[in-house]
């Protein structure tokens, strides 16, 4: 205790007995696949369907594609209440559309790769104030198909390039715009960009390799590659998610029967994850007809909505788990089929009286560990591990002694108590969790190796059943 001699106000630094742990987000997802345009090979986060259109469809009214389920899945995610989503866009050997006009020798290049750029047309017309001797100004219009365009007025030979490349709308579509060295005056003309390609057909390995985009993301939990249903891809998703603490959502192949789904489900296992079935039908703006699409994106949105609105420990199933955006399902599951699929961990997507289309099943892909039987078990477990791991980073480089152990224990217990009082853990504090960080799991040998070991147990359902989590931090030896 400090000794103070004179009257006054004194400030003293005191090391807190515990640190505050912020609960990690578990509602952020990533969808991987082919988009109309956008950055390729690097996942980018978006917060709305409108932002997807801007970044991955060049602002077009119809961002949907005949050869990709990804845009439909993204639409399903946001329609169902998802808030934050990474897009992992992939293409193989794709080319940007480009052209050099014959009249003005203008070279224009599309902003991103893809056949979409072949719909870009550039038109130069004399402005209303054009005068051959005093005002040689033009209006330049850049259009993408018939659905969207922008007109930049009163440009001249000296200003046209900068005007196009700095226009907020035009630069969504055009990345390069330049005049030939010999161009000394502008003239009216229209020309179209060409030779844009979506690249060669993607192989299973391309989708598997695309999972590496997640390596640099630290806030993703939910993972899906919509409509890609080969065993190679699904096995890779399960393995990647198991190894990286993520929650996979798989799709069955289009047209799969209940029996085929049952057989496939029994052939796989994972720490956690979801296998929804069957596919759903939604209105397709491309054809104005119903299109049958995979359910992974829609289900991901329902999960994200439930986590944010009700809590990570609330099952995303039942009459509250309404699936928005589907007009009907590929086929209606019978009660007998549901009673067969639900117990083995298939999330049945079905229509219920007075509720509409809902998720009627909350069991996960873990068929070996009874403590991870439900979707909520896996999501809560992943959330606790990430929250505690991130929240105990303060311990790194600290002296590995009893004082540190006490602080870490108090920090972890405070976080777990918050979960208990929110309803995520059951029972009294003694029944709901425990934290061990002492000389029983931090021996002289482990301390010499620079390790801090923390063991946490918690009871998500039954107070007598504990799920064990062991964390290890690498700490410089003292």
Predicted regions and their residues:
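Short, flexible helical or helix-coil boundary motifs
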Residues: 81, 167-168, 181
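Structured, hydrophobic secondary-structure cores that serve as assembly/anchoring elements
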Residues: 1-117, 130-137, 143-145, 206-478
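Gly/charged, well-structured mid-domain segments that form the phosphate/adenylate-handling core
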Residues: 166, 173-179, 412
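Conserved aromatic
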Residues: 46, 152-154
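Surface-exposed loop/edge segments in extracytoplasmic proteins
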Residues: 147-151
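Broad, structure-driven detector of short, well-ordered beta-strand segments within folded domains
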Residues: 118-128
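Long, low-complexity, polar/charged, intrinsically disordered or flexibly structured peripheral segments
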Residues: 182-202, 207
